Amino acid sequence: ADTIVAVELDTYPNTDIGDPNYPHIGIDIKSIRSKKIAKWNMQDGKVATAHIIYNSVGKRLSAVVSYPNADSATVSYDVDLDNVLPEWVRVGLSATTGLYKETNTILSWSFTSKLKSNSTAETNALHFTFNQFTKDQKDLILQGDATTDSDGNLQLTRVSSDGTPQGNSVGRALFYAPVHIWESSAVVASFDATFTFLIKSPDSDPADGITFFISNMDSTIPSGSGGRLLGLFPDAN
């Protein structure tokens, strides 16, 4: 099975797998059952920003999701990613819809990782920024239903030609280049990721959510990982 660390922006409460009964953000370590969650006042049809940071000194993974002129949702969890993830990984975004649906539209995405080996050595960094997405985005690996549209957005799940979200869809987008996420000799390993997104739903209950995830390099969408499993995990264990 894949090794996954993720921050989930979960719009649908699947209480049978440990979700609270409201939209929430959560930190997932190798399981869809979040280690830590925080309530999230999801706003339909408004652009939001998600910001995720990790630093190996504090060994804390944190996420903030915010809308303009509104309170932010914040969640953090203490974890040593050296013990969880392989040394080389890929970073991606995933989303799903189920019986209920929503648009899972990504408008921009940036990521920076740094490895500092000692006080004299240079920092080894990887950085990318997408302020918009092109029709044939060669530096992204698109999986499942993920596509880039003519408006310069990344649609992680299926939408019809008039922009209506479709149910039972799963899609992911990974940056093509592997990321050196940790190294035994590194003094500090850190990363931060930011993406802006728009969730819009014709349903009273939107579903299912968006994640930022880090995985082994050859990760693919697991069979049966639609809906509540957010395109990341084969089961709810």
Swiss-Prot record:
Question: Which of this chain's residues are annotated to bind a carbohydrate?
Answer: N14, L99, Y100, D208, R228
**Keyword terms:** Calcium, Lectin, Manganese, Mannose-binding, Metal-binding
Keyword Calcium in the entry? The reply is yes
Entry's Gene Ontology molecular function annotations: D-mannose binding; metal ion binding
Superkingdom = Eukaryota
Pfam families reported in the protein's UniProt record: Lectin_legB (PF00139)
Gene3D superfamilies hit by this protein: 2.60.120.200
Coiled coil (residue ranges): none
Detail which positions bind Ca(2+). Answer: D10, Y12, N14, D19
Q: Which family does it belong to?
A: Belongs to the leguminous lectin family.
Name assigned to this protein: Lectin ConGF
Organism equals Canavalia grandiflora (Jackbean)
